[in-house]
Design a protein with these regions (language model features):
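Formylglycine-dependent sulfatase
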Residues: 3, 18-304
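Single conserved hydrophobic/aromatic residue that forms the stacking wall/gate
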Residues: 303-312
């Protein structure tokens, strides 16, 4: 479970190295499959994600929930999705969200003088403003509240969903690029007097299958059109991760930053006509519990502990 892995790593690093209040960068991919990264042998080259593996720690028995909202709820609370009552993706008009009685990760970090940012997908409640991320401990939110979004038009279920701090924001551009650019802006403008918690939830490579044509053209060797687009979406995300890490380097704060990377669940083959390798077949069909990598760029220090984890 996510809570056990985070608590174990936090305890080890804090006990052995004694660093306090590092910056924390959590990056979640959406529906990233086992064979979508080149360090697992994929034809999709992901040098920046691979770099996290080569210089950090990979947990190859790191389990997440089978769908979006449950995994995100567990990550925010350190509690099981069943206990939280979130066992399926939260639909657009559903009167449900991450329980308002739950104290979540950014709220704890704010008490430790962290500036807290969420970019990208929320998917933990949007029926009333009380569920919005800026009411749950995030100082800043830039992204979408629902479970999916058009990469170019930012429309989900017939409604426009691109937000900035509880207000609709009419914005042009590819979703992955918008998230990347805002992350870089936040890093460049970060005040060193406080620590930064930056939670980046990419939409990629979740459907709809959309990517810049120049990236799609890089994968003309792939027979399936859907696979080419999917590969381009992963490529764009990997490139964005590389640029974000470079921004940390330029700001001279990479060595004091914990980087956590994972996927919320595995790939979604019925929509994508994907290579069976993405699913780790023949034993798994469709989305189910997946082994995901937990990676750190700098693993020798951390202060990432949740009081709720201690009590679970």
């Amino acid at each position: 479970m996510i809570k056990n892995n985070l608590l174990l790593l936090a305890s080890i690093f804090f006990t052995n190295y004694g660093f306090s209040s590092p910056n924390i960068l959590i990056i979640l991919a959406d529906d990233l499959g086992w064979n979508d990264v080149s360090y697992h042998g994929s034809e999709i080259k992901t040098p920046n994600i691979d770099g996290l593996i080569s210089s950090g720690v990979e947990l190859d028995r790191f389990y997440v929930q089978p769908t979006c909202s449950p995994t995100r709820a567990e990550l925010m609370t350190g509690k099981s999705a069943i206990r939280l009552g979130i066992t399926r993706p939260i639909s657009k008009n559903q009167k449900l969200g991450l329980g308002l009685n739950e104290k979540i990760l950014p709220q704890y970090l704010k008490e430790m003088n962290y500036q807290t940012y969420l970019l990208g997908k929320w998917h933990l409640g949007a029926y009333t403003p009380e569920y919005f991320p800026t009411r749950r401990g995030f100082d800043y939110f830039y992204g979408y509240l629902q479970g999916g979004n058009g990469y170019w038009d930012h429309v989900h279920g017939g409604g426009y969903d691109w937000q900035k701090n509880e207000k609709l924001l009419r914005k042009e551009g590819y979703t992955t690029h918008l998230i990347r650019d805002d992350a870089i802006r936040i890093i460049e403008n970060h005040d060193d007097q406080s620590s930064m918690f930056l939670n980046i939830n990419f939409g990629a490579p979740h459907t709809p299958n959309e990517a810049p044509q120049e990236s799609i053209n890089k994968f003309n060797n792939l027979e399936s059109e859907n696979r080419r687009i999917h590969a381009a979406m992963v490529h764009e995300m990997d490139d964005a991760i590389g640029k974000i890490i470079n921004a940390l380097k330029k700001k001279n704060i990479l060595d004091n930053t914990i980087i956590f990377f994972a996927s919320d669940n595995g790939g979604l083959p019925p929509n994508l006509e994907l290579d069976p390798g993405i699913l780790n077949l023949p034993y798994k069909l469709g989305i189910c519990d997946w082994e995901r990598p937990l990676s750190f760029e700098a693993v020798s220090y951390t202060h990432l502990t949740l009081p709720t984890m201690d009590s679970v």
